[in-house]
């Protein structure tokens, strides 16, 4: 992705705006932990490096999961693994929370920080979804649905930020309360074991008609449904905020909503392919999951770039085209039926290449425009004058 001169010039007009209504971060996390952690961070450490180190903790979590699941072929992991997941996610959230403060106190705030932060958050969202799926041992359909819903919330929030110009965090948001809940999920599993979430419990007789169609429940299903409900409320709030901003600026609501269409087109293809080739999804779930993760990360990145450069909204994502082609083929000619494995491995490779190229080019252009480094703070930073 190449940024033209006008887009680069518009970068200098960008001003970060956020509204955080989280009581947890305002009264507990920020004063008693995040502010204290910031004091021990060297002034020489670049904000983006802090963000990247935070992601590194989660990458370690992913590696432990992959080793135990695919090398040792275990579904239930040792307690220390779950404990390390909780610690890793807690550190990720902490580092992600202070990178902006580090940028302000070192005078290195720039649109690159916004792009870098959102890009890392997009990758982390997929990582945490994968860990949660493994912990709760969800079936294939529930696993796909969980990734769809979790990434939808993030995408809608990014779409909302584009139209409102403000990052809005509700009283119960994913980056704060949602992550804290997942940390608690990992920590409790380390103590109780994963069977704690999977054990069947009889529905109380006092629940009346609910007991007639739900005689048993699990703690895992209760947590899953609660988080789904909270996610739905946040999605609806983001839709409301964005559409109000569009109407206030005399924009087209239909045009604004069409910005969400590519996301739903992609996932319609995913679900239709799962219905057609369930065995393939069972054997290659990790491939499909990573594919969706990279497409999502690219989509979010392009939207953020459009936002900070005051560019038109990107209504189309070329990376979803192979998904659509495969879905149409599955229900018509069936040409790709016998080469699904090769097709998707090539597809993943293309997505990684496109996303990597996008990240490298955008970072290079923004750092050159501002005369800065991405992961270091120069001793004498120089700003390029227009």
From Swiss-Prot:
Q: Which residues cross the membrane?
A: 48-68, 78-98, 136-156, 171-191, 213-233, 253-273, 285-305, 316-336, 344-364
Stated membrane topology is:
Multi-pass membrane protein
What keywords would UniProt list here? Membrane, Transferase, Transmembrane, Transmembrane helix
Q: Where in the cell is it found?
A: Membrane
**InterPro entries membership:** CDP-OH_P_trans, CDP-OH_PTrfase_TM_dom, CDP_ALCOHOL_P_TRANSF_CS, CHOPT
Task: Show the GO MF annotations.
Answer: diacylglycerol cholinephosphotransferase activity; ethanolaminephosphotransferase activity
**Listed name of the protein:** Uncharacterized CDP-alcohol phosphatidyltransferase class-I family protein C22A12.10
Q: Does the keyword 4Fe-4S apply?
A: no
The keyword Transmembrane helix is annotated on this UniProt entry: yes
Cysteine-cysteine disulfides: none
Which family, according to the similarity comment? Belongs to the CDP-alcohol phosphatidyltransferase class-I family.
Quote the PROSITE patterns the UniProt record gives: CDP_ALCOHOL_P_TRANSF
- Would you say which domain of life the source belongs to? Eukaryota
GO cellular component terms, alphabetically, are: endoplasmic reticulum; endoplasmic reticulum membrane; nuclear envelope
The Gene Ontology biological process annotation of the record reads:
mitotic nuclear membrane biogenesis; phosphatidic acid biosynthetic process; phosphatidylcholine biosynthetic process; phosphatidylethanolamine biosynthetic process
A UniProt-annotated Pfam family: CDP-OH_P_transf
């Amino acid at each position: 992705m190449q940024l033209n001169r006008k887009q680069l010039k518009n970068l200098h007009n960008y001003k970060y705006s956020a509204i955080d209504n989280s009581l947890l971060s305002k009264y507990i996390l920020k004063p008693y932990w995040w502010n204290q952690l910031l004091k021990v961070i060297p002034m020489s450490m670049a904000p983006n490096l802090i963000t990247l180190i935070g992601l590194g903790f989660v990458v370690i979590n992913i590696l432990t999961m992959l080793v135990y699941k695919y090398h040792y072929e275990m579904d239930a992991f040792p307690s220390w693994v779950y404990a390390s997941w909780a610690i890793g996610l807690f550190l990720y959230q902490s580092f992600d929370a202070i990178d902006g403060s580090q940028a302000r106190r070192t005078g290195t705030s720039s649109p690159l920080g916004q792009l870098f932060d959102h890009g890392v958050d997009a990758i982390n969202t997929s990582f945490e979804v994968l860990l949660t799926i493994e912990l709760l041992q969800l079936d294939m359909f529930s696993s796909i649905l969980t990734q769809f819903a979790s990434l939808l919330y993030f995408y809608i929030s990014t779409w909302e930020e584009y139209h409102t110009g403000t990052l809005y965090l509700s009283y119960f948001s994913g980056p704060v309360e949602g992550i804290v809940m997942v940390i608690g999920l990992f920590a409790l599993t380390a103590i109780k074991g994963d069977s704690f979430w999977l054990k069947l419990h009889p529905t109380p007789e006092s629940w009346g008609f609910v007991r007639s169609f739900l005689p048993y429940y699990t703690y895992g299903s209760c947590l899953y449904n609660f988080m789904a409900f909270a996610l739905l409320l946040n999605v609806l709030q983001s839709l409301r905020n964005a559409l109000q901003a569009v109407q206030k600026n005399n924009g087209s609501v239909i045009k604004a909503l069409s910005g969400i269409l590519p996301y739903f087109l992609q996932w319609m293809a995913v679900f239709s392919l799962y219905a057609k080739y369930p065995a393939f999804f069972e054997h290659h779930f990790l491939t499909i999951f990573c594919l969706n993760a990279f497409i999502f990360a690219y989509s979010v990145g392009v939207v953020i770039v459009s936002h900070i450069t005051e560019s038109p909204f990107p209504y189309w994502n070329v990376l979803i085209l192979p998904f659509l082609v495969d879905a149409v083929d599955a229900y018509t000619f069936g040409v790709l039926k016998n080469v699904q494995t090769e097709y998707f491995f090539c597809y993943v490779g293309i997505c990684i290449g496109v996303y990597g190229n996008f990240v490298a080019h955008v970072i290079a252009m923004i750092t050159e425009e501002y005369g800065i480094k991405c992961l270091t703070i120069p001793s004498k930073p120089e700003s390029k004058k227009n």
